[in-house]
Amino acid sequence: MLNRTHSQGDFNRVGAFVRAGAALLVLAATCAAQSAAGGQPVSKTSSGSGAAATYADAKAAAPAAAAPKVGEAAPDFKLPYATAEKLFMKPDEQMSLASLKGKNVILAFYPADWSGGCTTEVCTFRDTFMEFGKLNAMVLGISGDYVFSHQEWAKHHKLPFPLLSDHDHRVAKAYDSYMEQYGFNKRTVYLIDKEGVVRYVNLAFKAGDKKDYDSLRAELEKLK
């Protein structure tokens, strides 16, 4: 009979493994971009992350699905997710967009947990979370990372919103938010209103640019 009990040390080791794996994936993406550029180093973005520049540089080359446009119905989805406190993996626990009707939804696609630019982004959303809440909006982060990584990252940064796991990237593809050649999401943000209609789209959201957050907030204020 297998012993199914786990110590806190076991979970800490799993968390360390997840963080190390995410870092290796980001490093691999950076190296791939350098190789494509003839060995030239990838320039850093304002967030200070060379990997973030890799994602930005790849946007033009990524195969583009038809992105949902402002005024169109947002594609529905149902995905497992994690919060800092709990994993939601069973089919009847997963989050669907349809279940969120009646709330404005900020859907933030990002490349990878633990990377520099993505940490800047989610922590900025964390710090403005109460402000968005007053506008009847909830934030959903979404990447291809597993829920186990999501939960460790959410705990580490005390994130107050869910992180969805789109491991096969089918949702990211439906929202033109996936880079096929790197296997990561683009950094994009959608604002979806209470009726499930797209009201704002930014397919080149910048994690460290205050203007992008301000423009999102301005659109959200119109929906009060």
What are the language-model segments listed below?
Residues 2-88:
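N-terminal targeting signals for export/organelle localization
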Residues 106-107, 139:
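Hydrophobic beta-strand anchors of alpha/beta hydrolase catalytic cores
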Residues 113-159, 169-173:
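Structural microenvironment flanking redox-active thiols in thiol-disulfide oxidoreductases
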Residues 159-161, 178-190:
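Structural micro-motif
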Residues 162-166:
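Short acidic-hydrophobic, aromatic-tinged amphipathic segments that line or gate anion-handling sites
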Residues 75, 104-106, 186-188:
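Short loop/turn microsegments at loop-to-beta-strand junctions
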Residues 78-105:
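A short beta-strand-turn-helix
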Residues 186-224:
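Thiol-/selenol-based redox modules, centered on thioredoxin-like
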